[in-house]
Amino acid sequence: MRVLGLMSGTSADGIDAVLVDFTGDPSRPKWQILNTFSYEYPSSIREKIIQVGQGLKISSKDWLELAEEITELNAFAARTCDPDSTAEVVGCHGQTLFHRSVKKSKRGGSLQILLGPLLANLLDQIVIYDFRSKDIASGGHGAPLVALVDEALVGRLYGWRGVLNLGGIANLTIIPPKTGIDKTSQCLGWDCGPANSLVDLAVKESTNSSLTFDENGSLASLGIPKLEIIDKWLRDPFFYLEPPRSTGREQFGFQYLQKRKKELGDISKEDLISTLTTFTASIISQDLDNLFKLKQIRLIELLVAGGGSKNLFLMRQLQKQCCGVHVRPIHEIGVPSQYREALVFATLSWWNFLGKKVHPKYITGANKPILYGVRVDP
């Protein structure tokens, strides 16, 4: 079955589209990517998305027009990736504007902006969208949803395997081995903390918007990370919350960056970017250490996806800090890093079409099996 997946992440840099053909057992399918397309948001839209997500007040008219524009851009990406409309289903995540983590006395919340019925009619195809609401209504965090699909897409090894996504936010999937006493264990997943969100903001600020991200980690590699400050940052109570755990740009965004910059004082932009990038690697390393302390789980391999996998300095830091773990980009096993999340939502859309529910208890914390997404016919 052909499915088109559309994804725009917390980095808000654009839309990734993937056309994929699924066959076989939905729990461990064979899949083949037929085409991909990436659309970069105009800077005006990206800025508005980030600003609205961090509290900018806009009128109802502006809300509607932003939703329409994002929907129309997703339609453009879909048509470009699948010009003959061969997909039986289109799965579209929409653009996250706000995420609220679950608190003891308050349910979580997550807002993705997309007009699903409009997209279905623009494309004249079945659309699956609004993937997080059912999870949140069932007591879950609504994130990280990629962890629900990773085992089906990448499979198991003879030891514990991890999949790390480095988008705006970093999240981890922990996949049990296929043999031995742990083979009946559950897949685990959680949001770790900031990945590219802080670095991208800092790069833009420190270069007067001439750069929007640290390509290949070139700025970070020229600086010296402030390790004693990083050790202090790692004591943030968020990093000690046991999974399920979720977060977003609301927690690790502009205000958080300003606070951390004040603590760092007057340092060069290279040292700032190096410190923030090393901080991300240290968060992952600390999470893996805590995983062993709490559950005696030690990874043999960590597959890295997302924009951060192209950051050579960050990849070196991960290998350095995650001792004994083979760290490598996910594209080495045939999963294209840039399109992994679009592939995930294509898979969830396929499962929705088939009526396949998933129990996310050990990933999002939801209390029952869920059919992810809402179907809209044209």
From Swiss-Prot:
HAMAP family named among the record's database cross-references: AnhMurNAc_kinase (MF_01270)
Q: Which Pfam families match?
A: AnmK
- Keywords assigned: ATP-binding, Carbohydrate metabolism, Kinase, Nucleotide-binding, Transferase
List, alphabetically, the Gene3D superfamilies matched: 3.30.420.40
Q: Which residues bind ATP?
A: 9-16
| Catalysis: reaction(s) | 1,6-anhydro-N-acetyl-beta-muramate + ATP + H2O = N-acetyl-D-muramate 6-phosphate + ADP + H(+)
- Protein name from the UniProt record: Anhydro-N-acetylmuramic acid kinase
Annotated function: Catalyzes the specific phosphorylation of 1,6-anhydro-N-acetylmuramic acid (anhMurNAc) with the simultaneous cleavage of the 1,6-anhydro ring, generating MurNAc-6-P. Is required for the utilization of anhMurNAc either imported from the medium or derived from its own cell wall murein, and thus plays a role in cell wall recycling.
Single GO biological process annotation from the record: amino sugar metabolic process
Q: Recorded E.C. number(s)?
A: 2.7.1.170
Domain of life the protein comes from: Bacteria
Q: In which pathway does it act?
A: Amino-sugar metabolism; 1,6-anhydro-N-acetylmuramate degradation; Cell wall biogenesis; peptidoglycan recycling
Task: Quote one Gene Ontology molecular function term.
Answer: kinase activity
The organism named in the record is Prochlorococcus marinus (strain NATL2A)
The UniProt entry's sequence similarity note says: Belongs to the anhydro-N-acetylmuramic acid kinase family.
